[in-house]
């Protein structure tokens, strides 16, 4: 199925979640072209608005994208009371209360919180499409090996976070590695 033109802001947010997902990235990369074209969006997966995970996907997508008050109307139009009971799957360092009105506390701002929310979107989109988690993990490890290494603290651009979820700048991380950083979070 192809992505239908959005009939509301809510469907636009769901389309954005799909477009940002690992599976959509994999599909686009496997086309063999070096660029994304407008017609590629018509080939994106369509998620059922009735699926039990739709609201969770929408919340994470909104919190990743509604960064300033310019997006207040979008946040308010897409607001769902179920957002109040939605809990993150992965750890959040800066989880602040949200409500139907956009505030500066609405977006996820810490690098690790944002990365975790995107990972949750990747998994939920896969679940909504019926893709087994093992297949998603295989795609992640084999087709996105650099991202996999970065997520696991390896490589030139490794994602390493401080105790508050902020990503360490590369020069700081490199200096830390020269001093032989601990090999696990417990260290």
Where are these regions (language model features)?
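S-adenosyl-L-methionine
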Residues: 1-187
């Amino acid at each position: 199925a192809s992505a239908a033109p959005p009939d509301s802001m809510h469907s636009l947010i769901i389309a954005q979640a799909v477009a940002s997902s690992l599976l959509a990235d994999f599909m686009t990369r496997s086309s063999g072209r070096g660029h994304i074209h407008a017609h590629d969006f018509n080939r994106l997966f369509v998620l059922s608005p009735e699926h039990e995970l739709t609201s969770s996907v929408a919340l994470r997508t909104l919190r990743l994208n509604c960064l300033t008050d310019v997006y207040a109307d979008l946040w308010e139009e897409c607001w769902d009371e179920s957002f109040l009971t939605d809990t993150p799957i992965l750890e959040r360092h800066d989880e602040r209360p949200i409500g139907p009105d956009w505030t500066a506390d609405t977006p996820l701002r810490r690098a690790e919180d944002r990365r975790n929310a995107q990972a949750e979107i990747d998994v939920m989109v896969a679940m909504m499409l019926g893709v087994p988690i093992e297949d998603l993990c295989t795609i992640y490890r084999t087709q996105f090996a650099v991202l996999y290494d970065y997520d696991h603290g390896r490589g030139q651009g490794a994602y390493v976070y401080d105790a508050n979820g902020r990503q360490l700048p590369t020069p700081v991380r490199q200096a830390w590695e020269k001093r032989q950083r601990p090999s696990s979070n417990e260290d």
